[in-house]
Amino acid sequence: MVNITIDNHTIAVPSGTTIMEAAASIHIPIPKLCYLKDINEIGACRVCVVEIEGQDHLVTSCNNVVEEGMTIYTNSPKVRRNRKHTVEMILSQHDAQCATCVRSGNCTLQTVANDLNIVDSPYKKEICIEEWDTRYPLVRDASKCVKCMRCIQVCDKIQGMHIWDVSGTGARTTVGVSENRDIKTADCALCGQCITHCPTGALRERDDTDKLYRALEDKDTIVVAQIAPAVRAAWGESLGLSREEATVEKIVDALRRIGVDYVFDTTFSADLTIMEEGTEFVERFTNGDLDMYPMFTSCCPGWVRFIKSQYPQMVNRLSSAKSPQEMFGAVMKTAFAKKMNIDPDRIFALSIMPCVAKKDEREKPLFHGEFAGHGVDCVLTTRELDRLIRADHIDSKTLKDAAFDTPFTEGTGAGVIFGATGGVMEAALRSAYYLITGKNPEVDAFKQIRGVNKNGWTEAQFEIAGNTIDIAVVSGLQNTRNLMEAIQKREVHYHFVEVMACPGGCVGGGGQPIHEGKELASDRGSNLYFLDKTAHLRFSHENPDIKHLYDEYFGSPGSHKAHQLLHVQK
């Protein structure tokens, strides 16, 4: 242990503890702007400086470790003056039009400046302006960049994509797309992790709420919404609702108040995905197609973008099943329209998703032949949903639980856990077991695949009707790259692999609410598993609305019509 004094508090901390960590252990907060534990500890912002007795210069607390006998002052007059000057200089290069920024009220720079009682910026403004195609799902505003390097480090260390890099020198230093590439050709997976780790509004998703408003204003348009599983685990966080209060049924109420005509749960189409993907897996496994390389899940568009750009030779190993979002879009424009006697051209299909890449997925024409067109018309992230609710002046405390609309009311616990890493695989195995044996397994027979082991992915082996099935589950694109390399080198072999681009799965998606310095994917995922545990239906193949859909429209999983509408044509 190391004995130190911080702001007149004498404490002992383990060797190797940083000054910032030592201060936090006795509830002394030190302001910071660029720091992300274990990811970005470079002291670039110099907001976290402290004074050490006997030293002339101030030191950054995020990356300097304590030493025996140190006396540290976190808020001495010298520290206060320096810290305030540093933030004022940062503000001189920052477009501080906070009232029109999506991060207003949830901006680390804004919080630090307010806490330092900065009411004016005494320095000449030198704002960096760079062109960016704001039609792209990911938007970067250079005028709000504070050069913290978080986006670079997250993209490099966690996702392994190296999309961002430093450019320029000295006062002209900035962050941009690496190698001076255009973002549209830079192989970005659109995972959005750079957005959720940015301390300001320099990175954000394209806002599509106006597109929804235009549809709502058109009296001839019928707006049909779907809500993804992971959204229910996070939407209430920035609206002051506890997890117990923030039910998915209250989102239904909010959307109806806004003017949406029909609201459905994407867990329904997650169950539909399981029926199609599970059937495909059983067929490919039985035919020996998986003896050498696995079948990969295809519901995560960030992962699909990744495999297409990084491992194009493996694209044919993807399941042909569309994602739950796109399956529901297809069902809305066909089976739903037919059942409700609605002209499909009048339907505006809205998705509420935890994901930035879903905006890009929507733009891909995934219908074919007589069904050519787009299934989904607009995708809003969880953050956009929250902004939508506030823009309509809806007090979240007044929301009531409202039921989903018919004819697709039911969703199972298996569909709910799609939002957490391992959930798709677990749901698929529950139904694959039934498809192979004609019997249900123990409902939690496959729960060992939840979580991540030291290799960065989880692997397991199951026996089903005398068949040995090897599976793997991975989230985060650097982990995914490591797994793909191991598969290609034949170091490992699996029959079925689930991949999620975002760490922790959709619950940690790039469109989820942002909390400075906190990673909430695990907590949100636990919430989804609780909802599964308490659901009255936990097997996708037992969903009565899924059974009715097949009986009335598709015939059976894997049928010709199902392949036309629910699968990507390879």
Regions found by a protein language model. Name each.
Residues M1-H9:
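Eukaryote-biased recognition of intrinsically disordered, low-complexity regulatory segments
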Residues I6, G168, I464-G466:
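A generic beta-sheet turn/junction motif
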Residues D7, L138-D141, Q226, V499-M500:
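Short glycine-rich or small-residue beta-strand-to-loop segments that form or flank ligand, phosphate
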Residues H9-S15:
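A short N-terminal beta-strand-loop micro-motif at the entrance of redox/enzyme domains
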Residues P14, Y136, V146, A189, ...:
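Residue-level recognition of alpha-helix initiation/capping sites
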Residues S15-G69, N75, V79, R206-K570:
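Iron-sulfur-associated redox domains of electron-transfer enzymes in respiratory
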Residues R46-L190, T196, L203-D218, I222:
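Fe-S ferredoxin-like electron-transfer domains
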Residues H162, I195, L385-I389:
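Mobile "lid/hinge" segments at catalytic clefts and subdomain interfaces of large enzymes
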